[in-house]
């Protein structure tokens, strides 16, 4: 089989395997995440690359638990956690060549979590040669999640009781009707003022400091777009697939297809292609030197 055809083959997860992935995430939440929420001691919180970039003992313990569970289910898969990458940045170089890679954000929104805010989640994605094929956005406090899989129609929301519903992105509209997430601090300082000048064009702008819940709001039609200037795979791979399967349109701002192997660039996720095209034209100045 040629490399090209091998890369095009899909990978699917039987329902029972997906259920076991979810069980592992729930176990991590019950054992490591929820018991420490609003109960962390100062020595259990550490700074990584910047004052707002935090890691807690709960991040480390939950990532270890989820990694162990995924390794047992998929012994041949590459498994990459955010905190593992903090120790070994070179792990990211292996995503593009991996036929199956799991990417874990054990607590997305760690700053919120460490400061007692309830806006945090767990993100798990699977990729094939960098392309997302499975995505899960889990809310530990509500014990519910959004899920999508390549080769399976649509994206779904599953409540803690097991009730399911399909997800659908919004219909969009005029600029002054759009609600979005723009991460101003992720843009180089010389362009921040010009990007800030765009904000009054929109209906509402926000920043949750939590990709998990930003993508959830986009996928369920509550928000219309998200512009990100930092494209860490644990923040985006799952949400990209879920939004696409819910009817959204997601590409890099320069028109490239999204890949979890990308290390730089701007990622624009929108409720539909027409909205994406309008926003791409507005934000195109970010692509100039």
Tell where the protein language model's regions lie, with residue ranges.
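An extended, acidic
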Residues: 169-289
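N-terminal subdomain of lithium-sensitive/metallo-dependent phosphomonoesterases centered on the IMPase/IPPase/PAP
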Residues: 1-107
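Residue-level signal for inorganic ion chemistry
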Residues: 33, 59, 70, 110, ...
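Detector for glycine-centered tight turns/loop "hinges" at secondary-structure junctions
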Residues: 130, 162-164, 255
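Generic detector of well-ordered alpha-helical packing
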Residues: 60, 83, 106-109, 140, ...
